[in-house]
């Protein structure tokens, strides 16, 4: 089974955590932590910084790795590396998501 490696940012600010709502694809409308697929040659930390810049147009501070979650979908195996992060620079701008909420 094919393994897909992704990264996810658990972005915190003022005691709340950011959730984003997908704006495209099979899971459109579903809520998630922002992130995405790793590219060849990237470290996990490089991937999460790049993905958040692409999706939300902000720079983040990666504070620590929280966990790696593995799950078997019918078509592939998912390996998701989750990081505790904060916004280091910029103002959130949704580039790929249809909505975002601080929870």
Residue spans for each PLM region:
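Conserved N-terminal beta-strand and adjoining loop/helix that marks the start
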Residues: 1-17, 37
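Conserved hydrophobic "DFG−1" position in protein kinase catalytic cores
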Residues: 11-12, 19, 85-87, 102
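Nudix hydrolase/Nudix homology domain
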Residues: 26, 31, 93-103
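The catalytic Nudix box helix
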Residues: 33-65
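A short, internal acetyl-CoA/4′-phosphopantetheine-binding micro-motif in the GNAT/acyltransferase core
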Residues: 37-40, 88, 103
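Active-site-adjacent beta-strand/loop module that shapes the phosphate/pyrophosphate-binding cleft
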Residues: 59, 69-92, 101
